[in-house]
Amino acid sequence: MPYEANVTDVAYRYDGSFAGFLCCVFESYARHEIPSEVCSPEEGQLNLFGTREILTDRQRAKRVAVGLDRLGPQVKDRIVTGFLSTDPGKDLTLLRFARRCFAQGPQAVQMLGDPDVAAAFAIERAVNNEAGKFIEFIRFEERDGMLGTVIHPKHQVCLLYTSDAADD
């Protein structure tokens, strides 16, 4: 692991928001540690060891977001899109990916031989593939003057459709 961090037994617990996740990245960087898990309230405590509650601090989240902007759109998009996944463990995977990119720069996004980068790429691809599937096959019907449809996505892909709808 080329970045300076110790893998610890402690799990990070945060509020489930994207800003909260960015605060987990900040905490990991500040403490020079990689947690054993990063869990949101829906997941509960998954390990027997200590849990550190990470409070959402907008200033810290903004600092990490600015850092992601500096790394370029590929890195930021991979983390933002990956965050929409509902796969267990995605938070830790994305945290490790962010740490790798902060340590090695924007070129780290292309290092698919690295397990952290490959796992983040797989998460992003799964979300984008599902979003593409739904955008191609979704059919709306009219009821009482409103258009609607019922879908059951695995990931939180509906957020990706808002920019598509605004462009039309």
Explain the meaning of each model-derived region.
Residues 150-152, 156, 163:
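Extended, Lys/Arg-enriched charged tracts that mediate electrostatic binding to polyanionic substrates
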Residues 2-58:
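N-terminal ordered "arm"
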Residues 161-168:
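Conserved small/polar residues in nucleotide/adenosyl-binding loops
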Residues 16-18, 142, 153-155:
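Short, flexible loop/turn elements at secondary-structure junctions
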Residues 22-23, 158-160:
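Short helix/loop capping segments that flank catalytic or ligand/cofactor-binding pockets
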Residues 128-148, 162:
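Type-3 copper protein
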Residues 51-131:
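Charged, alpha-helical interface segments at or near domain boundaries
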Residues 111-114, 148-152:
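Flexible, glycine/proline-enriched loop segments at strand-loop-helix junctions
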